[in-house]
A protein has these predicted regions:
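Short low-complexity stretches enriched in small and charged residues
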Residues: 4-5, 12-14, 80-82, 169-172
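Basic, nucleic-acid-binding surfaces and adjacent catalytic neighborhoods in DNA/RNA-processing proteins
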Residues: 10, 97-220
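A cross-family signal for N-terminal binding/gating loops and helix N-caps
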Residues: 1-65, 159, 187-197, 203-204, ...
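Phosphate/anion-contacting hairpin/loop surfaces
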Residues: 19-117, 122-129, 137, 144
Length: 220
């Protein structure tokens, strides 16, 4: 069985252990029939099966590939939050958690102890979709804001999955095809020059060491 949790791929090896894979910034899994495989640069792990290989390729080496037993697996994910695409979200609980914090909304979306699976690209796009500013403090949000936020996060994630993800630099699917969600970005890595024909301008700032793209006029 192969499943996903947060940004991890989990492969059940048997009833008591799993393989944990994180693609990092540039990692990808590749599948080859044995007769077709030729080792490429940055092929760090090769798993052999009867008729094919699964290869983990990672140029920038930010990925992870390791094995855990069931007890270790529970402990490893114990501090992770809710999965926006799988778990039922209790709006009241999220609102209460946000009211106790005074961090920026963008920072909260990247905090994997609150929600899992959102990276920088999708946090930027989701906030634009619901027209909420990344600079807003979490304790300033009301119930309606939370509802809009959750809906937008789910929308952006589902749309990205439908379009094969975002292939900006290195990402490819296991069959080698590129994702196309990057062509649908509204704000991420968009410059003022690109957006001159639009009715809004995108501003870039740095929050907690990460690039944030947003429209100051549309996102409040």
């Amino acid at each position: 069985e192969v499943r996903r949790f947060a940004k991890y791929i989990l492969v059940n090896l048997n009833s008591h252990s799993s393989l944990i894979i994180h693609l990092g910034m540039s990692g990808r899994l590749k599948f080859y029939l044995k007769k077709n495989y030729q080792k490429e640069k940055h092929d760090h792990i090769v798993i052999e099966f009867d008729k094919f290989y699964i290869v983990f390729n990672d140029p920038r080496r930010f990925g992870m590939f390791f094995k855990l037993n069931n007890k270790e697996l529970i402990s490893f994910f114990s501090n992770y939050g809710l999965d926006l695409l799988v778990d039922k979200i209790n709006i009241s609980n999220v609102l209460e958690k946000f009211k106790k914090k005074s961090i920026s909304l963008k920072q909260a979306l990247l905090d994997q102890s609150i929600f899992v699976g959102l990276g920088n690209i999708y946090a930027n796009e989701a906030l634009f979709h619901c027209r909420l500013s990344p600079l807003r403090s979490t304790n300033s949000l009301n119930r309606e804001d939370i509802l809009k936020l959750i809906k937008s996060c789910r929308h952006v994630l589902k749309l990205s999955l439908k379009n094969g993800g975002s292939s900006i630099n290195d990402y490819k699917s296991p069959d080698g095809t590129l994702g196309s969600f990057q062509s649908m970005f509204h704000v991420y890595q968009k410059t003022e020059v690109i957006l001159k024909k639009r009715s809004f301008i995108v501003k870039k700032i740095i929050q907690n060491g990460r690039s944030t793209f947003f429209s100051p006029t549309l996102q409040k």
